[in-house]
Amino acid sequence: SMDFKISEKMQATLELVDEFVDKELLPLEQDYLTLDFKDLLPTLAKKREMVKKMELWGPNIPKELGGMGLSMVDHGLFSERLGRTPLGHYVFGCQAPDAGNIEILHLHGNEEQKKKYLKPLARGEIRSCFGMTEVDMPGSNPVMMETTAIKDGDDYIINGHKWYTTGADGSAFCIVMAVTDPDAPPHLRSSMIIVPTDTPGFNLIRNIPVMGHSGSDYASHGEIIFQSCRVPQKNLLGEGGMGFAMAQERLGPGRIHHCMRWLGICNRAFDLLCQRANTRVISPDGKPLASKQIVQEWIADSAAEIQAARLMTLYAAWRIDTVGPKAARDDVGTIKYVVANTMQRVIDRALQVHGGLGMTDDTILAYFYRHERAARIYDGADEVHKSTVARRILEKYK
C-alpha cells in the first residue's frame, strides 16, 4: 500500500527543523559566504549544542550512538528541510562524508574501531573524510585504482594520490580505499583502511579551488598524497577485498540523502524565484516580473519538476526501507540524475529572474550554482547512471 501520510510526531519535528533553519542558520549565510569556514566554527558549535538539546542531532545516526535513528523516508524528509541552507546538514550532524563513514563504521567496524573512531564521530567531536577518487583514474569506475596498501610486518604501507576528498582539511581520520590484492578479480582487489590524518606520509597538499573558491576546513575538497604512509593492519575496516562492495553499500543511501538535500535547495531557489518575480517591478505602471508569461512558465515548470523529483525520491527511499538497497538500485540510480538536473534547472531559472544580482553573493543562488553543478558528476555521473539503468531495462526485452 502507498501511504504518503507523515506521522504527527515527524510533522512536529519537521516544523521545529524549519523554524531552527529560519531563525538560527539563514542569518549566518552571509558570514558563510564571506568568511573562512574555520572562523565560523565557534558559532556553529553553539548551534550544534542547541540541536542536541532539542534532541534533533544525527537524524541518520542510530539511536544507540546518540542519534535519531530515522527510517530512510523520514531522514529524507528531514534532509529536505536542512538542504535549504548549506549549513543545515553540518549543524545537525548528518553531513557528507561523515554520514557515510558513520554508516560503514557502524556496519563493519570492530569494537576497538567503533570506540576510537565511530563514537566521537557520531557525537560530532571529530570529523572524517573518505579517500576514493584518484587523480589519474576514472572516478566513475572505482575498480580502477592505483593507490596500494602493501603488508609489511603488522602494518600496511600506503602509497597513492587521491583528490576531491571532501573536508580532508581538519579531519581526524580518512577512510582510504586502496588495492590490497592486485591479483584478485577486479571487484575484490581493494579494501577500506582507516588512516589517522596525523600519520607521517599522509600529506594534504591543497584544498582544490572549486570555481574559484578553495574553502577551508569542512567546506573544502582536498588533494592528498600518501607517501609510504604506515598504519597498523588492525586499521583494516571490515574484510580485506571488500572495498568495492562497501563503497557501493555506502553510496546507495548516500544518494537518497543527496537527492533530498538537493530538493531542499530546489525549494529554496523556488521560493527566491517566486518572491523576486512578485516584487521586482519592471515597468512604470508597476507591473512585476511575474506578469511576464515566460516567468510564469518557469514557475509552473519548476513547481511540476520539483514535485515529480520529490515523489520519485521518496518512492526510492520507501523502496530501500521495504525491499532493501539492492532491489531498489534502479530507483536510486534514476533519481540521482533526475533530481540533479531538476536542481540545476531550478537554480538557473531563479538566478535568471534575479538578473545581475543572481551572479553576486548577495543571495545564496550563486553559491548553489557554483557548488551544486557538481551534483551531475560526483557519486556517479549522469551518463553512467543512465547507461546502467538503460542496460537493465533492455535486459527485460531480450
Question: For each predicted feature, which ranges?
Answer:
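Alpha-helical interface subdomain recognition
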Residues: M2-H89, C94-Q95, H108-Q113, P120-E125, ...
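Flexible, glycine-rich active-site loops centered on histidine and acidic residues
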Residues: I102-H108, F130-G131
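Short Gly/Pro-enriched turn/cap motifs at secondary-structure boundaries
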Residues: L121, D136-S140, Y164-G167, P182-A184, ...
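A short, Trp-centered hydrophobic/proline-enriched beta-strand micro-motif
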Residues: G124-T133, M177
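Hydrophobic, small-residue-rich alpha-helical packing segments that form membrane-like cores
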Residues: M137-N141, M145, K151, Y156
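Flexible, small-/acidic-enriched active-site or ligand-binding loops
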Residues: M144, D198-R230
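A short core secondary-structure module
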Residues: N159-I205
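Long, acidic (Asp/Glu-rich), low-complexity accessory segments flanking structured domains
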Residues: S228-M246
